[in-house]
């Protein structure tokens, strides 16, 4: 099936990518409870922004699926990790061996290792699903800072 047909099929089912559809179907098959794009996480760049993670597992783990892992996505996730260190955000890549950009030596996997993110390829590993719960997330997670703005 062509990439355009895969994406069209995913959109028809309410997802943004073929990988998201594939993961949701796998979770549905094993009757695993999850939420799709159900929370928003506020983070600060030059302005306040919100991030909507792809999947929130019943144990509180946040799953972000990525076919392409662009510079702006990497920057965003580093900022979110710094601003919300209590969140357990993990990646499921289409291919974690893919290079960060053309001519780069580092791959998506190496970036995750360097910055302390857990990752896997194409599926959510069973041990992630079986991990004991961390916490439930509110529908909106606000950015909070202790620094005084002037």
Locate predicted features.
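Nucleic-acid endo/exonuclease domains
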Residues: 1-150
């Amino acid at each position: 099936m062509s990439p355009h047909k895969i994406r069209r099929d995913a959109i028809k089912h309410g997802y943004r990518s073929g990988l998201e559809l594939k993961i949701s179907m796998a979770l549905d098959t094993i009757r695993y409870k999850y939420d799709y794009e159900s929370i928003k996480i506020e983070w600060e760049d030059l302005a306040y922004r919100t991030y909507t993670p792809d999947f929130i597992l019943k144990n509180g783990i946040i799953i972000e699926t990525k076919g392409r892992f662009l510079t702006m996505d990497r920057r965003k996730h580093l900022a979110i990790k710094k601003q919300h260190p209590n969140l357990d955000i993990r990646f499921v890549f289409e291919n974690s061996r893919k290079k960060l950009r053309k001519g780069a030596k580092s791959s998506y996997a190496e970036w995750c290792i360097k910055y302390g993110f857990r990752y896997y390829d194409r599926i959510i590993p069973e041990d992630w699903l079986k991990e004991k719960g961390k916490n439930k997330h509110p529908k909106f997670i606000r950015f909070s800072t202790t620094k005084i703005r002037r």
